[in-house]
Amino acid sequence: MKKYLYFPGCSLKGSGKAYEESFLAVCKALGMDIRELEDWNCCGATAYMSVEETKSYALAGRNLAIAEREDLDVIAPCSACYLVLNKTQKALKENTEIRRKVVNALKAGGLDYKGTVKVRHPLDVLINDVGLEKISKLIKNPVKGLKLAPYYGCQIVRPYATFDDQHDPVTMDKLMKAAGAECVTWPLKTRCCGGSLTGTVPEVGLRLAYIILKEAKKRGAGAIVTLCPLCQFNLDGYQGKIASKYESVDMPVLYFTQVLGLAMGLPGSELGIKRGIISAEAVLAGGGLR
Amino acid sequence: MSEQFEPKIVAFFCNWCTYTAADLAGVSRLKYAPNARVIRVMCSGRVDPQFVLDAFAKGADGVLLGGCHPGDCHYAEGNYKTLRRMRMLTRMLKDMGIYDGRFRLEWISGAEGDKVKSVINDMTKKVRALGPLDLPGKFKNWDKEIEELEAQVNKGDKDKEAVHAG
Amino acid sequence: MTENKSKKETLPRVGFYICHCGSNIASMIDVLEVQKYAAALPGVAVSREYKYMCSDPGQEMIAKDIKEHKLERLVVAACSPNLHEETFRKAAAKGGLNPFFFQMVNIREHAAWVHEDKKSATEKAKDLARAAIARVRFHKSLDKKRVAVDPNVLVVGGGIAGIHAALTLANAGKKVTLVEREATIGGHMAAFDKTFPTLDCAACILTPKMSAVKSHPNITLWTYSEVSKVEGYVGNYKVTVTRKPRFVKEDLCVGCMECIDACVFKEPKFKDKFNQGLGKRKPVYIDFPQATPKVVLVDPETCIQLKTGKCKQPCAAACDRKAFDFNQKAETKELQVGAIVLSTGFKTYDVARSPQYGYGRYPGVYTALEVERLVNASGPTSGEVVLRDGTHPKAVGIIHCVGSRDAKTNKWCSRVCCMYSLKLAHLIKEHSGAEVYNFYIDMRAPGKAYEEFYDKLLGEGVHFIRGRVDEVTDWAMTPEEEGKLVLRVEDTLAGFVRRIPVDMVVLSTGLEPQPDAQEVRRRFNIGCGSEGFFQERHPKLAPVNTFTDGIYIAGACQAPRDIPDTVAQAGAAAAEALSLIDAGFVELEPNTSHIVEEECSGCKTCVPLCPYSAITFDEAKKKATINEVLCKGCGVCAAACPSGSIRQNLFEDDEIFSEIEGVLAK
Amino acid sequence: MLEQKVKYEGDCDKEFAKWVTSQTGGENLRHCIQCGICSATCPLSLYMDYTPRRLINMAREGFKKEVLGSFTIWLCASCYACRVECPKEIQVTDIMYLLKRRAIEEGVYPRRFPIPVLAREFGRMIFMFGRVNETLLVIDLFLRTNWFKFLGMTGLGMNLMRTGRMSLIPETIKNRAELRKVLDALDADEKSKREAVS
């Protein structure tokens, strides 16, 4: 059985706790050998990347350097981390100047990086390494009657991911169907939710989030299922403000790992189901789940 | 600023693909290093390993051989024969101490003007880094050494004779 | 060794000429310096520079010098030999010198145009000149070999290009075989309703030419057939053609179509390829009423008899000519031709590669070819613009450049899309009265009366929005967008993003090379450009010629091209073929190989090397011999001969060794 | 009051245009055919003063003042839609990044976009702890930019508390010294660069 390193990133330790809880629970249930990256630091995230490029490369570089010692694939569930780590990989490979700067900086810290680490997303690993077949076998109570709007957000399939289609990604749909859920087809799968702006330019962020939530509701989804802590936070956390600015949508936003966990018969408490600000209880009950 | 070494590269281009590609590069005004001297042959298969050896012997720092892509040869399969011959030749040259891309075989189709540019630029860069091969010079030195050696030997003999005489 | 030899002999008198080519060469190479340098080289009797060597005065100068200065060799430093070698050989001959006592130096394409430093470019020119002067001494007096040209012609591809080329040749009295892959000739044009910019009906102008092909005494028409093998050389090609089985005897069928009515399938239920799947057909079918030849055929994929052998075969029964033959097998035919015209056409871009436009996901999205059938009076809806769901569109969006001008799909502009989009916009508006929006990046209407056609459309009130559409979705944000297809685009001329709801989307797909273009070009031993279209010999001066003499290209197999240009090119290709045939013979380059018998050790190394089996072994003499008619002059044998007894004219060892020494000697 | 719209060649800065195309990510800028698909696909373009397409053209023509002063670069949410759609493979997102950096350097970014502040606090926090505590970051940010907006956020704060998604204790890494060495080394590198230039 293949071994993996796990890069949580800051969000999964904070507002994205439920993602970490459910992801690790599912890995455990699948018997995956996965270990948290030793003494990892913040990846730099896109906000930082946009103004302090080289530094964020170095931040990501330190994590990659630590991972390289172990010579294992790194799983980064957070979209921002996934993007930044991959972008760093690419920059270090293709841009000699950046490589020089970053590698020297790392040396100063007593670190060394050759550039061999593979940064991967849980979807990629679950579909391509574990395989739908094995997952389907472990589905004890399929979430029948649960109608989901799979929402991938921006930074997973764009621009670096190679494991899914950039215009119409399907990996999460496959997993959710395997879990017994029904997936609505909708065109906003990969449209930005404005998460990175809600904090700084709220009026804009809120509108983008509202558009996503409203369309999901219109398509008859009981809940949105996502794979990005920032998207989850943005779509879940601001529904109060959205209600006052536009209209109340009341749309629970789950992590795909939570739904998968439930279908595999794991208790909701281990999957952080209660951490949603918009409660998913009712919808899940509809899906025959407690 | 010190004059940097400019390698001399002899290039054998097949008429149908690589020579045409070089013409195309010209028509498209692509700019590349002026170090290669093209000798036109009808097919890369006409290139006798002796030509390559002769080029090195006469002072080339690099030899480039360009033909049609496998399967595209104007003469059906000439380039396959080239490939076989040149594999052997490459090993031979290695034994003679000529390697590190001083001899290079490239498939360049008539449409790949840009490849002519990149290949010649790249090869010029690499061979320049390797420095002069200068076989003619080496030959001279070797001749000189041998002459000196002979001279010494002859001298030695004379001394002996002297001793006997004494 | 070569060099000693050259020193012993008294050197032949060489004339060296260097061309300025206006400023093309002179701007990057110090022509005078090279000319002076050459003058001082051993054996050079005359060294001159001139503004345009290829001009008449230039050639005259050479001819005159040869006589006056008793020149024995000629070297011209100018452009590529592919361009002017023949010109200067003729000049040599004019001066009374054997044309092969000439060597050309390429200092334009290979030096002046590709370098930026005048000093090093000039040095390079000197080296190349010195090499040619050293080499030309070893040249021998040669004669071109004449071979007769077979007057028959093969035309491959029965679209408008092939049809026009075949008719032109046949009218000139040549026997033409036209080979078409599909069951009927006509190509893409046969599917169109109207043609831009004149809006005359495609069928009205095409079908007469199609029947002319069928009835022409000089044309043999082989449809449902493909060329499988090509051997030989210019003037003498041997071609093998495979004829697929129609399961109907072509010579017996009169196209009454009784059999189609009789078929066990009472209703047509299979995807109709000719109608882009918008219509249905039976297992026994004919593409369209004017199909040529008007002969039915049976589809082995769907015919019960052919699949299971268990059918009552009412079709065969209904045929009073007894034309059906379910045991028909593919047959191969061979023919001899002197020239070949390739007009294999194009393929349209596969819209599945652009999922963002929703083709296949939203039934309201169509490809341009589908719409051609939809607006076609003889199409599946008899020209009525009805959507797949039976409704009539109130608003239609036409997206230009789908699969064109895009690094992710095809980089090139497909040249015809702007114009056919205008045509479709006009026809859709005319047939349905719908609001029509054209989404374009740049409007390209460069042909005769094309801009006027654009102007006409502007007058008709068609909307033109300059911007590339991002995506087609069913995502509504306002009430009027509900239930519509929404196109999101920046109106780049207004400077803001717009969302435009429509009922029908037309994807103006670009043109691509045929999927099997690579195999075909290998079969005919020609080249393809990097984008995959057939490569012409020269983009301006030899647009229908290829690098293989006697093989010509016409139409969209060479590059995206509209009907007027295609027909013009087909005519040009036919003319090239005619000039080859009517000359009656071709002169082949004398660069063939021969064996110096006394030096041949009889080792047989060369025999298996020749791809044309031109080398045989004379058991009596224990020597190899080369048939110079079969030899194509690659020189592979010469390179391989251990005893060096094989000599390739124009590329003898002496010549090449001296050239090597020439470029290196300083 | 009417504003003059004509631009004179003197109004554009060719050096700036050269600079943009010379940066990593800016390479293909000159190849833009102004098809506008970047604007069409951009979820934020409806708020931008100049659409991405217009910004690209202004940048390559050297209208530095307008480009660096625009909201556009600050509204980019780095969703990379434009980068994926661009038929000329222009790295629009990265161009937005490098324009942001330049705007900060020249101190011309519009005050209402506290992204630079966010970034600075972000950096400070990482330097201190090696990781980022979102709660502290957000509080910090709002206190520095617009504190009554912060009051508006308390509702969300309570919710996060309730669901145990908010902690006020910063996460820290063990080997902070190592990380600081790395970051300092970069600063040093930058400094030496700048000195080399001046």
Across the structure, where does each feature detected by a protein language model lie?
Chain B
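Iron-sulfur-associated redox domains of electron-transfer enzymes in respiratory
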Residues: 1-166
